[in-house]
Amino acid sequence: MNPLRRKRLLIILAVLGGVGLALTLALSALKENINLFYTPSQIANGQAPLGTRIRAGGMVEKGSLQRSTDSLDVRFVVTDFNKSVTIAYRGILPDLFREGQGIVALGKLDAQGVVVADEVLAKHDEKYMPPEVSKALRESGQATPAPASMPARQADR
């Protein structure tokens, strides 16, 4: 092989190696930032990965909110009306957080089936429901619950 061809081959191999390395790093970074949404039924059925950051959403069960008296620890149960999952959170809950309303919790699932959340998102107003929660409730056979101040037929629009 003459020196010119050898030099071109080395340059092409170096460029391909650099592109491959950059692509690997980019895909690795994207994989770390993907938070897949899981319903309480999917989590209870073992479809959600342990130790991986996920988004869990549903309706907060009435009477399930437990606050610690000496810390910011909070536990509550989220349901899709088929199955339920416990959410453990340390921090201040959003002002709009209420029992009986839809939330999305971001965190990791532990071996006991509890989602240890580092972020809790509450719906914005009485008509809003996170799209994932609304879809999950429809798929589970439950209509999107109507707020107390709205007639049921208006809530499904």
Curated annotation (Swiss-Prot):
GO MF entries: heme binding; metal ion binding
Stretches the record annotates as Disordered: 132-157
Binding-site list for heme: H124, Y128
Keyword field: Cell inner membrane, Cell membrane, Cytochrome c-type biogenesis, Heme, Iron, Membrane, Metal-binding, Signal-anchor, Transmembrane, Transmembrane helix
Transmembrane segment boundaries: 9-29
Location(s), subcellular: Cell inner membrane
One GO biological process term: cytochrome complex assembly
UniProt name for this protein: Cytochrome c-type biogenesis protein CcmE
UniProt function note: Heme chaperone required for the biogenesis of c-type cytochromes. Transiently binds heme delivered by CcmC and transfers the heme to apo-cytochromes in a process facilitated by CcmF and CcmH.
SUPFAM superfamilies listed in its UniProt record: Heme chaperone CcmE (SSF82093)
Cystine connections: none
Organism: Pseudomonas syringae pv. tomato (strain ATCC BAA-871 / DC3000)
Topology with respect to the bilayer: Single-pass type II membrane protein
GO terms under cellular component: plasma membrane
UniProt superkingdom: Bacteria
Entry similarity comment: Belongs to the CcmE/CycJ family.
Periplasmic side: 30-157
One Pfam family hit: CcmE
Primary location group: membrane
Cytoplasmic side: 1-8
